[in-house]
Amino acid sequence: MSAMRLFALTSAMLPLAFILSTSPFPATAAEKNVIVEQRNASSSPKQRLDQLFSQLKRERDPDKASSIANEIRLEWNDSGSATINLLMQWADKAIEEKRNPAALDFLDEAIALKPDYAESWNRRATLNFVMGNYRKSMSDIEHVLNIEPRHFGALSGMAAILSNSGNDQLTLKAWERFLDIYPADRTAQEQVNMLAEKLAGNRT
């Protein structure tokens, strides 16, 4: 699992496939072209995201919901600033080459230039987790959720950290928040059911 994949977990925790599916990856050139073509010139990024999240909340088919989630990720990956986008690309490359200190520098700069861009915080949260800096990772996640409370990728990261700490009750709450945004995700459903049963068993 590369550093860009959101929050590596042990086999007893989240399946790798789910972490990959909830991580917001950098968009390819082709994907960015699709975004541009699909965007309505009269709609703002916030309006597009609001519409996509509304669709995601209503959709019950997992495959269709996954497609909507991918559109949301693509929107998240565009900061609206060429400078920030370039810094994020440099950070991604540094992470891929395992130059984590350089990646942190790029992400720190992106955050300093545009502190309201959630994805730079989220990317740094991922890197901090991979580097074992769990408190810093959770702090970054909280910043992400302050900016974009519907960030299901950050919520899955929060659940991963809480699960690692052994706090099943708070892990369950994180997954319930996730499902309130993205109800069709099967793995999140399984996590909620598993944790609910485990906690119920502990009470008996």
UniProtKB/Swiss-Prot annotation:
TPR repeats: 84-117, 118-151, 153-185
InterPro entries from the UniProt entry: TPR-like_helical_dom_sf, TPR_rpt
Keywords for the protein's UniProt record, in alphabetical order: Repeat, Signal, TPR repeat
SMART domains: TPR
Domain of life: Bacteria
Signal peptide start-end: 1-29
Name recorded for this polypeptide: TPR repeat-containing protein RHE_CH03534.1
